[in-house]
Amino acid sequence: NISEADRQFVLKYMSQYPTESLYPPYADEPQTYWPVYCKFLLFGAEKNKLPDNIRIFNKPGDAYGHLIDAAYIVDFKNKIEFFLSAVIYCNSDGILNDDKYDYDNIGKPFMKNLGELIYDYELKRIYKNRPDLSPFLFTYDLLPK
């Protein structure tokens, strides 16, 4: 079993953006770790700041041409939430372990478009009951710049 304190810890740090982190000090390297760094679903490789009403709790990864993201995405303003997980193979030359993968030109645009498609669907979907998202509001280490 996981304690409530441990659960809150995991949720907070899965949703914290690099620019909100004290340790490691990702905020010191904004060219390398921008606000939506590793938030592939919905934002791909964009370096824009995330809207204040959206928070993404995710575990991303990449290895041997596979780009992976598993996310719980919440929009506090519109009171929508959804889970989305995707794995895409981004290796057009078929050679593994050559560090030549198509993450930026195939994988991340796909992830962004997939996330946007589901987000737009959820915005239009009729809900019988809107979720209470207040348990997912956290105070982060640093305020975004």
Predicted regions and their residues:
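Structured C-terminal helix/loop/strand segments within mature extracytoplasmic catalytic/sensor domains
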Residues: 1-145
